[in-house]
């Protein structure tokens, strides 16, 4: 099952959040594996793609339960790294294939607050009066979502995470290098390519609502978002179910178990998606650990917004220091979760 709906935990309220969690729990008990898009709003779900978020850090209540697999979004990093020729064919193959191999990834993020984007435009920082967000950079909160559950229960006010807000407790299976000791459910669990064109990458798809599509995909429309990533992950799960001959239910315990074997206590250099410009992850990797970039977005106001000077700030876990919400790191992180996946290796490794 794949779900692409999403609204903030605080706005949904405790009753609806509990209802969603109970539905997913029932589904998993009946053998269903539930995948939910983490969202396309960075870590500012309560502003839902607003140009200048003002409500601080928040995530979708549709994907923050302990009974679903939250799917975040990445972008390919070849354009930023200047290595596109290494990974793409000059022309499509007879079957319209274009990629030569797996390529480096980074979190999907269209905002001026994104460090790779601001760096590529020649700015030392995305924030401050001399930063990219205050000098023509795109004010956008469109990015792969992720962050800690912070208002699944209790009540906030005015779209803010305050009052009696509290997150879902951390599931026993959510253990991995990089997982914070915050006591709450962290999202996403995994990620997949979700870019919508900023760096030249997006999904080509056939929209038949206006008629049939031509035979050449180069004439088809393109788009991105975690609403692509989530159903594709559900497709991966269908391969596993077919291989094992039986439904699997909630797969998160197995995902984190496999990731722990691969990453260990210090992360895995061999499976680092973003290790070097010229290197590729080992062909035996099941997960690719994304360690380049962030899913940070621009913001206004004084709630989780670092604004040292200028008029536009960047989403931060600190108002007084630059602590981007959120960066990448070894193993798990709020920008991409465990990371992305080698599907064939995952199917073959599934217990």
Predicted regions and their residues:
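Extracellular protease catalytic domains of secreted zymogens
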Residues: 1-351
């Amino acid at each position: 099952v794949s779900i692409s709906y999403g609204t903030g935990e605080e706005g949904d309220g405790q009753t609806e959040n509990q209802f969603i969690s109970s539905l997913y729990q029932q589904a998993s008990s009946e053998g269903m594996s539930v995948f939910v898009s983490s969202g396309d709003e960075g870590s500012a779900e309560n502003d839902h793609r607003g140009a200048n978020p003002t409500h601080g850090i928040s995530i979708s209540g549709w994907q923050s339960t302990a009974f679903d697999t939250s799917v975040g979004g990445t972008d390919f990093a070849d354009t930023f790294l200047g290595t596109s020729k290494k990974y793409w064919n000059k022309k499509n193959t007879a079957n319209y294939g274009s990629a030569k191999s797996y390529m480096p990834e980074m979190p999907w993020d269209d905002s001026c607050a994104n460090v790779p984007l601001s760096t590529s435009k020649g700015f030392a920082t995305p924030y401050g009066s001399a930063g990219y967000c205050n000098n023509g950079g795109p004010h956008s909160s469109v990015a792969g979502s992720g962050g800690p559950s912070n208002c699944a229960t209790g009540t906030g006010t005015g779209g803010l995470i305050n009052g009696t807000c509290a997150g879902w407790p951390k599931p026993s299976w959510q253990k991995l290098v990089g997982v914070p000791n915050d006591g709450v459910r962290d999202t996403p669990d995994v990620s997949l390519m979700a870019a919508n064109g900023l760096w030249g990458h997006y999904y080509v798809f056939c929209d038949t609502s206006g008629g049939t599509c031509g035979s050449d995909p180069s004439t088809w429309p393109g788009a991105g978002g975690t609403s692509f990533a989530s159903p594709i992950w559900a497709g991966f799960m269908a391969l596993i179910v077919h291989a094992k001959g039986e439904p699997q239910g909630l797969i998160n315990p197995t995902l984190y178990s496999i990731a722990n074997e691969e990453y260990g206590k210090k992360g895995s250099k061999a499976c680092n998606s973003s290790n070097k410009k010229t290197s590729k992850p080992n062909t035996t990797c099941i997960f690719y650990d994304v360690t380049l970039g962030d899913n940070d977005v621009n913001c206004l106001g004084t709630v989780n917004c670092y604004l040292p000077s200028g008029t536009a700030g960047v989403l931060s876990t600190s108002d007084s220091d630059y602590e981007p919400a959120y960066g990448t790191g070894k193993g798990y992180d709020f920008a991409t979760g465990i990371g992305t996946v080698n599907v064939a290796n995952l199917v073959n490794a599934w217990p």
